Amino acid sequence: MSDTATLPTWENLVKKQLKTEDIYPILEKENLERIEVRPFYTDVQKPLANLPKVEESTHLVAKYHESLEDEVFAFMLDQNVENLDEKTFFVNNKDLAGHISPREEDQYFSLIDVFNEKEGSIDDQLAKELLAKGFKRSICVDISLHQNAGAAIYQQLGIALAKTKELIEAYGPEILNKLIFKIAVGGNYFFEMAKLRAFKMVFNQLSKEYNLDEVPYIFAETSFRNKAISDNENNLIRSTLELAAAMIGGADAVYTNNYLVSRSTDNSEEISFKQQIVLAYESIINVFEDASNGSYYVEDTTQQIADKSWALFVEMEDAGGYLELLKQGIVQKKIYEHAIQEQQWIEEGKIKLIGVNLYPKLDIKKSIEELYNEKEIKAVRWAEMFE
């Protein structure tokens, strides 16, 4: 159908339902990402090609526990484990990584970030040790901290590209297929889906600057930012939606952080992992290469995020690059500015957090000034203001 045939019909129907001629102020919702979201789509300006992922099906990653050895094929390791065969391991302990000798039947991935965010430097010795290990992916570019600290989506991706460029300059473009990107997925369902897709676009664009055609390896985990200590059941619902967005967005591996914020139990760890199992085996959303391809809304949002992310990356490079901007405190300040805007929206109720600022609305116990520091990139949960 053409725009002229469908849009007026839709507008007339909505006018009747809303009982007003001026429908767009009601339907258009402001967002801090400054992404234009239309209430009605009939096409997309730039149809996108299928955005591939590295793995054929998404790895469902569980924190290692002996009881899961027979059921789980991909583990998060922070301690040494013996006699596990034909498994996939994501190692997040640099001391442990130093003692691992990969075998052919196993797959090892490093989740160890070689960047020192406080000093604005790369741990060169650690990076070289990891590269010498023979892991399937040796160097982790971690932007989960930035999401949990309150960075905008386009800031997260721009920073990921800027960190990647620093690694290329240090170790050459051949490092691109040795990288794994650790990305935290928040609660803005379609935006987060588009975030992963947009990153595939801009990373591939960066690789082509070096005559390569690389696809990023994405390790997606659930966010801490929208979780609350006293709201466990809602945490569980939120993280399930985040996992779904990650799988549909094309993550190569997913991991569920414990839905209990202040503590961890064997039962909570098991339930957190089984969220992935339900989505994968009942909804079967972990096997599609680009499940949201063809959705006008997601594709348009993907393109907007990609454009904003690339523009920020270019701006950062022109200003000296990621490490230099860290040393100047500019990265920290930009994240801080967006983070406090988000927190203000939480305080005002523009961002709804059920059980925190709505149903019921809790009393504020900490100010924004107490929670955030413009000189430091640190994770802050929205609910901390009320706890």
Please state what every model-predicted region is.
Residues 157-164, 179-272:
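Glycine-rich anion/phosphate-binding loop at the beta-strand->alpha-helix junction
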Residues 141-161, 248-253, 257-289, 293, ...:
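Mobile "lid/hinge" segments at catalytic clefts and subdomain interfaces of large enzymes
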